Amino acid sequence: MDAEIPWPRSPLHRLAAAGTYFVTAGTYLKKPWFAERRRLEVLHRGLLKVADEFAWHLQAWAVFSNHYHFVAHSPESGAKSLPKMLGKLHGKTAVWVNKLDQTPGRKVWYNYRETILDHEGSYLARLNYVHQNAVHHGLVPVANQYPCCSARWFEKAATPAQVAMMYAVKTDRVNVIDDFDDKMRSEG
């Protein structure tokens, strides 16, 4: 076959339907631009703020030096606001971190991937995956010790039975591109 099939440079985003989504976004070249505590806290607060502003209801989140994950319910009107929401977060945090580093215009963010979660098993597995992600990356021994994720919040808001059930959900079959380990710490 002589016809070439164009290869997309970024993932196709299918965001028409309202629903629950799992989202992962990473920095350009997986650089740990947010490795310092203050930077990480700004990114963390920024995610919580834009989600609220765009009426996305976060269920779980984990924010790191070079990527983040979250599970959220979209607004009832649908998920089409996701690119604008993440564009605002990425734009503001990129300008801010570039100002700190005196590198105006440097590319900070790469792209994001989203998956609609339309089965309860997928939803529960990804919730637990996000709650436990700091443990997965070797940053803390227990998820609730990591300050920029939802595990501590979840453990306070849920009943002990809900916490036990959630943490018993297996995540070993969750298919997530999460190869950020070797780049997460500062390259100083």
Region spans (language model):
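Short catalytic/metal-binding and nucleic-acid-binding patches
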Residues: 1-188
